[in-house]
Regions:
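Surface-exposed loop/turn segments connecting beta-strands in extracellular beta-rich domains
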Residues: 5-8, 17-19, 34-37, 45-48, ...
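Short, Lys/Arg-rich amphipathic segments at extreme N-termini
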Residues: 1, 13, 30, 92-94, ...
């Protein structure tokens, strides 16, 4: 968890849940009230943070001017990325895919609350049980994403 941080860059990290089956499933990345930062080049598998109601492998709450780009978020437990009350955030060129059979990821990307002026583009998404992207009208501009479960004709 990072809270009230600004002007940061997190790059080139690997996060993999390797705990035993009885250990609490709580790993993930959570940014709260952060601004002017980047998360790039993350390689992750089986991030377990979140519940069906709230949270994701990568969760941003009340953040602005954050870029998440060129990350692989594979087999997240509930969802890949969630933004809550975020402004001017960019999710670009990420692979958010549940490869399990059967999958458990509800959504790849979800925006909730007072999100506005965000950009979701050129992401590769697949394996969502519900929908690949869930957001309210006006929460983000969405373009150029590839939904592997529903490819364009």
């Amino acid at each position: 968890v990072m809270e009230d941080c600004g002007g940061f860059a997190i790059a080139g990290n690997t996060l993999v849940w390797r705990s035993d089956a009885d250990a609490p499933q709580r790993d993930g990345i959570k940014l709260v009230r952060c601004s002017a930062g980047t998360l790039t080049g993350l390689q992750s598998e089986h991030l377990c943070y979140g519940t069906p109601e709230r949270g994701a492998g990568v969760t941003l709450e009340q953040c602005h001017d954050i870029t998440i780009g060129h990350c692989q978020i594979l087999d997240p437990q509930v969802r890949g990325i969630e933004l809550l009350d975020c402004v001017r955030c960019q999710l670009s060129a990420n692979s958010i895919i549940d490869r399990r059979d059967p999958p458990s990821m509800l959504q790849a990307i979800r925006l909730l609350g007072d999100c506005r002026d965000n950009l979701l583009h050129n992401n590769m998404l697949g394996g969502a049980v519900d929908q690949a992207i869930v957001l309210a009208d006006g929460a983000a501009t969405v373009r150029g994403n590839l939904d592997l479960d529903h490819p364009a004709d």
